[in-house]
A protein has these predicted regions:
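Short acidic/polar alpha-helix capping motifs at helix-coil junctions
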Residues: 5-10, 70-74
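Transmembrane helix-loop-helix hairpins at the membrane interface
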Residues: 19-24, 33-139
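Short, Lys/Arg-rich, polar N-terminal cytosolic tail immediately upstream
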Residues: 1-2
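Hydrophobic core of alpha-helical transmembrane segments in multi-pass integral membrane proteins
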Residues: 7-26
């Protein structure tokens, strides 16, 4: 991993920890329910599948069609993040959905910047593992 990539990746990991901390400050914190296999599915398998689908397929296809950039954020990243947030809209407390936007844009940034889904997968894994370890499974 090149130095710049390592620094950006470390900052993204730190941001993920901060976003999980921000979620803890909200009033709508779910009651933890620890069940091993659902935790494995939600914390480990789902982030890989979502990253492959959204970053590997959707964002890659949109990137080929839309070449527009808004600073470091591509139009493909914005559109993919909108779809990602919409997917999470029905599954989460509404106050938390806004906190999905920034991590999604970060995952997309790494997809665009390094032309790989490895970093988005690793970041999404970290995010979900922290989230479900701290807050448990949804009821």
């Amino acid at each position: 991993m090149k130095r710049r990539h390592a620094i950006e990746f470390t900052l993204a990991c730190a941001a993920s920890v901060m976003f999980i901390g921000a979620m803890a400050l909200l009033d709508e914190v779910p009651t933890p329910r620890y069940v091993f296999w659902p935790w494995v599915w939600l914390a480990l398998i789902t982030p890989v599948l979502e990253a492959l689908c959204f970053r590997g397929l959707v964002q890659t296809e949109l990137r080929q069609r839309f070449d527009r950039q808004f600073g470091p954020i591509s139009a493909a990243n914005l559109l993919t993040s909108a779809a990602f947030v919409a997917l999470h809209w029905a599954q989460n407390p509404k106050a938390w959905v806004g906190l999905v936007v920034i991590p999604s844009l970060v995952y997309g940034y790494f997809r665009d910047r390094y032309d790989s889904v490895k970093s988005p997968i690793a970041l999404h894994l970290l995010h979900n593992m922290l989230y479900f370890s701290l807050f448990g499974l949804p009821p």
